[in-house]
Amino acid sequence: MKADNPFDLLLPAAMAKVAEEAGVYKATKHPLKTFYLAITAGVFISIAFVFYITATTGTGTMPFGMAKLVGGICFSLGLILCVVCGADLFTSTVLIVVAKASGRITWGQLAKNWLNVYFGNLVGALLFVLLMWLSGEYMTANGQWGLNVLQTADHKVHHTFIEAVCLGILANLMVCLAVWMSYSGRSLMDKAFIMVLPVAMFVASGFEHSIANMFMIPMGIVIRDFASPEFWTAVGSAPENFSHLTVMNFITDNLIPVTIGNIIGGGLLVGLTYWVIYLRENDHH
């Protein structure tokens, strides 16, 4: 603890410097290492959505807000795993704009890192979709687990383009604020605990996270297309009721607009905002 900082944590200006250094490290490390870490992040976020679905299945008698709060708290596991284990998650990787704004990396390095991480996250999420499908987990609770996935995924492909962009902005505003606050902590529990409520807030509110959707919507598509007749009988529904769950609708109605929103929410509203406040003057001098 320094004499000019009476608190056992990093103060906001120092947090901004940590974000800058983290951005330089992320953008300059070996691309293959980045890709592997991105795959793990895709898996971690998928694990979090599995936890969310499991926790919210069968909560029909609970008040709406309480059920969503429980699910949101469970989902925070994903970001905690990414931060503590060092995985590269696209939605927090957008914060490397701080390093670019300070002139520490090039536009080319930024673009290559974003693309590498984004597609690594996609690979990790789709691998976990395969694992969950082969596990037969969708039949849990007499098929209600799978029905919860279908209903959640179907809702996500019914936003307008503008709605999806705005929901993406709101989601990554909270995710990047959670990551930014973790830069302040000095202990494992500091970093983990401080991220729970921002993540729980965005999940409970129904905001849209592009990487989480890389698991949830494909999982819904797989269940819709390949679930057994016994599943549909158990849940009292049919594939036709989820006809909007297609790969094309996933890409055009959710993934593209939500990704745009995530970049704006994290890169502009968090990263560049704090760069202007804490680092722009230093960079200018």
From Swiss-Prot:
Reported effect, H209 to D/F/K/W: Shows inactive, or poorly functional formate efflux. Retains capability for exogenous formate uptake. Uptake of the toxic formate analog hypophosphite is strongly impaired
Any single Gene Ontology cellular-component annotation: plasma membrane
Periplasmic side of membrane: 57-64, 136-160, 206-249
Family annotation (InterPro entries): Aquaporin-like, For/NO2_transpt, For/NO2_transpt_CS, Formate_transptr_FocA
Keywords: Cell inner membrane, Cell membrane, Membrane, Transmembrane, Transmembrane helix, Transport
Regulation: The efflux and influx of formate are mechanistically distinct processes that are controlled by the interplay between the conserved pore residues Thr-91 and His-209. The direction of formate translocation depends on external pH and electron donor source. Interaction with PflB is important for optimal translocation of formate by FocA. The N-terminal domain may also have a role in gating formate access.
Disruption phenotype: When both FocA and FocB are missing, an unidentified system can transport formate.
Recorded consequence of changing F90Y: Does not affect intracellular formate levels. Causes disassembly into lower oligomeric forms
Substitution effect: A99I: Does not affect intracellular formate levels. Causes disassembly into lower oligomeric forms
Outcome after substituting K156E: Slightly increases intracellular formate levels. Could be unable either to export or to import formate
An MF annotation (GO) of this entry: formate transmembrane transporter activity
Annotated transmembrane regions: 31-56, 65-85, 113-135, 161-181, 188-205, 250-276
Cytoplasmic membrane side: 1-30, 86-112, 182-187, 277-285
Compartment(s) where it occurs, according to its Swiss-Prot or TrEMBL record: Cell inner membrane
Induction of synthesis: Part of the focA-pflB operon, which is induced anaerobically. Transcription of the operon is restricted to the exponential phase of growth. Expression is subject to complex transcriptional and post-transcriptional control. The tight coupling between FocA and PflB synthesis ensures adequate substrate delivery to the appropriate formate dehydrogenase (FDH).
Site (Important for formate translocation): residue numbering on this chain: T91, H209
Recorded topology in the membrane: Multi-pass membrane protein
Catalytic activity: formate(in) = formate(out)
Gene3D superfamilies from the UniProt entry: Glycerol uptake facilitator protein (1.20.1080.10)
One GO term (biological process): response to acidic pH
Family listed: Belongs to the FNT transporter (TC 1.A.16) family.
Record text on subunit structure and interactions: Homopentamer. Interacts directly with the pyruvate formate-lyase PflB. PflB interacts with the cytoplasmically oriented face of FocA and the N-terminal helix of FocA is important for this specific interaction. Also interacts with the ketobutyrate/pyruvate formate-lyase TdcE.
Miscellaneous remark of the record: Overexpression results in enhanced sensitivity to the toxic formate analog hypophosphite.
Described function: Involved in the bidirectional transport of formate during mixed-acid fermentation. Functions to maintain relatively constant intracellular formate levels during growth, using different mechanisms for efflux and uptake of the anion. Has a strong preference for formate as a substrate in vivo and not other acidic fermentation products.
Protein name, UniProt field: Formate channel FocA
Encoding gene per record: focA
